[in-house]
Amino acid sequence: GFDTWNQQALLAPPPEANCGTNDDYGTAVAISGDTAVFGAQSDDVGINANQGSAYILERNAGGPDNWGVVKLLTASDGGPDEFFGGSVAISGDKVIIGASNDTIGAATQRGSAYIYERNNGGPDKWGEVKKIVALDGAEDDLFGSSVSISNNIVVVGAIYSGGPGLGNGAAYVFSQNAGGGNNWGQIKKLVAPDGADSDLFGISVAISGDSVVIGATEADVSADGQGAAYVFERSLGGPSNWG
């Protein structure tokens, strides 16, 4: 017969999370083994409205199958209206959090993403390792719209990359040791070969091993805004070419 899936827990914000009105706890969620990550993109951090935060929960923290909060993550350089936590992903002991509205220099809404590791700074400290941005990023790209991680490779979507406000969209691939140990350097920019304005390529991304899939919800195929998804392979077209 079919497997039966029953609800085990309601993961509402626990008291220790200090969630407030309109924090948007659960904006994005991800899980790996017994560790889960929840984004709260509209969380006010200090005096910064809508800076955003993310919570790490462990299955047996506070008791068997309790799913207790073990860490609150915020951007080390966070500011207002960055929406940190709008996208989250986890793979083993690594977490990545998107902040698509982050202002970089004078470029508003250029966007960024932050990588954390479980034991960075000490056992279970979940310390920030690196803030990553697109090398060719520009205002209104919304880099960090989506994130995914598999082992030592990260993929980040930027839905408006490629033009002022209405770009085709792009996704960026980063490798943990590109440019040095734990440097998380950019190794590839992925774009749709048939992309057009407002396709929103990069609105969703996923990676598993050597394969990446990118969503483009507004791509015109046989009808306007029908949507499409694009699959890329690491070694298609050459080693680490991501064709």
Model-derived regions, located:
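Conserved beta-strand/short-helix segments
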Residues: 1-243
